[in-house]
């Protein structure tokens, strides 16, 4: 069975054409810097919304196909690739589910962008404590029982953020 990789294949086809970089990002495929060879190779694939590569802000071709494959893989209705990393995803998720005064359950050791989004939207956080993992000497997941208890105490909750 051949796996489908529409975005990867489009990037490979683009790079094989050895195009001149007259667009952002400014590293120009790694050519104008003294970076290690392997990193320069990776930068060949760091391209923006160019012909044949689709557009993350409005996918209609290879990115749309890749997002559909990802959704299918995880049994989700839809899947979205993010621009600007996890921060934009956390902001979008909280803005889409909460408004001022809404209750949101949040893992106490979540990414700082989660707390930023909660503050920006004006939601009211209910903090969920993660278990301490003695093996790794770090915070682990929030126990299921903790989540159930929080939902009982605050049935008005609009969203829950568990990031680890």
Where are the regions a protein language model picked out?
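Conserved beta-loop-alpha segment that forms the PLP phosphate-binding cup at the N-terminus of a helix
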Residues: 78-101, 117
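Substrate-binding/gating loop at the entrance of the active-site cleft, primarily
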Residues: 106-123
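Conserved N-terminal alpha-helix of the aminotransferase class I/II PLP-enzyme fold
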Residues: 42-88, 109
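Well-ordered alpha-helical segments embedded in enzymatic catalytic cores
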Residues: 65-69, 89-93, 113, 142-149
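Short beta->alpha connector loops at strand-helix junctions that form conserved
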Residues: 107-108, 127-132
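Active-site phosphate-binding strand-loop segment of PLP-dependent enzymes
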Residues: 136-164
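N-terminal "arm"/small-domain region of PLP-dependent enzymes with the aminotransferase-like
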Residues: 1-61
